[in-house]
Curated annotation (Swiss-Prot):
Signal sequence, start to end: 1-17
Natural source organism: Bos taurus
Name this polypeptide is given: Cathepsin L2
Subcellular locations according to the entry: Lysosome
Maturation-removed propeptide residues: 18-113
Family: Belongs to the peptidase C1 family.
SUPFAM superfamilies: Cysteine proteinases
Active site: 138, 277, 301
A cellular component annotation (GO) from this entry: extracellular space
Function: Cysteine protease. May have an important role in corneal physiology.
InterPro entries associated with the record: Papain-like_cys_pep_sf (IPR038765), Pept_asp_AS (IPR025661), Pept_cys_AS (IPR000169), Pept_his_AS (IPR025660), Peptidase_C1A (IPR013128), Peptidase_C1A_C (IPR000668), Peptidase_C1A_papain-like (IPR039417), Prot_inhib_I29 (IPR013201)
Gene name tied to this protein: CTSV
Keyword Hydrolase in annotation: yes
Lineage summary: Eukaryota, Metazoa, Chordata, Craniata, Vertebrata
GO molecular function: cysteine-type endopeptidase activity
Length: 334
């Protein structure tokens, strides 16, 4: 991403005068820069520092309110600390919403008693948390996660699959590499192509290469199509319980999500329709002793293990389809 673009956007959102910086935060700022290996030009650093300080104040205020019982989740400074929320949404969130579903419709099992909690990470279905970098390829990570789970269900072997294969090769199905895409389009590419390479044979580069380097001899998975789940949390719950990890899209464009750390994520401003980020539901559960309260979805993100709850987020469950978690859910068939 061009640093000059970031600076231009930033300058539009901050007063033209030099920002007033808090000298008491000097040590924290230098430690954050060292941790995240940030190097700036002379003209950019104070603007980045101003954004970082603004984000830190938002985080500190939220956590103070959390300690007073006003929120159910904590926030923390992370690698996105020097990014405005506008930059964050442009760079990290690459899901492109679609109005018309193309897959088979999920038929909810009628005679199945679904458990009150499920966690597929404990059953061997889920690979370690990955990092999409500054590339809007969240859709590819969501798609590989769902297919990794279904292939494990079929073969008993967990193999990390290639997101770069999807980024480079699925444009004919409607995806746009680092500029966004859809999980269903990824599943369609895998069906059309006949297979998908492993992560080991086709490693992730976090960029558009403008060439497809798929190797048939390195094929590690395939699918026969995909299934779209009705836009209801009960249907999603049954799918997660009976099928495995499910690809979903959410509204992840809020500062509260950008700096989420732990607890059950709930933001009243979160939309159930304006979706911008593909993730993977790997289970669900509840906190405390009452299974009817404090319910959450276990969601695997693709921003590295340092973000959130070891790379995961607990998202509020049965709260009117909060953040649209059931709006665009699907999984591949194998």
């Amino acid at each position: 991403m061009n640093p000059s673009f970031f600076l231009t956007v930033l300058c539009l959102g901050v007063a033209s005068a030099a920002p007033k910086l808090d000298p008491n935060l000097d040590a924290h700022w230098h430690q954050w820069k060292a941790t995240h290996r940030r190097l700036y030009g002379m003209n950019e650093e104070e603007w980045r520092r101003a954004v970082w300080e603004k984000n830190k104040k938002i985080i500190d205020l939220h956590n103070q309110e959390y300690s007073e019982g006003k929120h159910g989740f904590r926030m923390a400074m992370n690698a996105f600390g020097d990014m405005t929320n506008e930059e964050f949404r442009q760079v990290m969130n690459g899901f492109q919403n679609q109005k018309h579903k193309k897959g088979k419709l999920f038929h909810e099992p009628l005679l199945v008693d679904v458990p009150k909690s499920v966690d597929w990470t404990k059953k061997g279905y889920v690979t370690p948390v990955k990092n999409q970098g500054q590339c809007g390829s969240c859709w590819a990570f969501s798609a590989t996660g769902a297919l990794e789970g279904q292939m494990f269900r079929k073969t008993g072997k967990l193999v990390s699959l290639s997101e770069q294969n999807l980024v480079d090769c699925s444009r004919a199905q409607g995806n746009q590499g680092c500029n966004g895409g859809l999980m269903d389009n990824a599943f369609q590419y895998i069906k059309d192509n006949g297979c998908l390479d492993s992560e080991e044979s086709y490693p992730y580069l976090a960029t558009d290469t403008n060439s497809c380097n798929y190797k048939p001899e390195c094929s590690a998975a395939n699918d026969t199509g995909f299934v779209d789940i009705p836009q209801r949390e009960k249907a999603l719950m049954k799918a997660v319980a009976t099928v495995g990890p499910i690809s979903v899209a959410i509204d992840a464009g809020h500062t509260s999500f950008q700096f989420y750390k732990s607890g059950i994520y709930y933001d009243p401003d979160c939309s159930s329709k304006d979706l911008d980020h593909g993730v993977l539901v790997v289970g669900y559960g509840f906190e405390g002793t009452d299974s009817n309260n404090n319910k959450f979805w276990i969601v695997k993100n693709s921003w590295g293990p340092e973000w959130g709850w070891n790379g995961y987020v607990k998202m509020a469950k049965d709260q009117n389809n909060h953040c649209g978690i059931a709006t665009a859910a699907s999984y591949p068939t194998v």
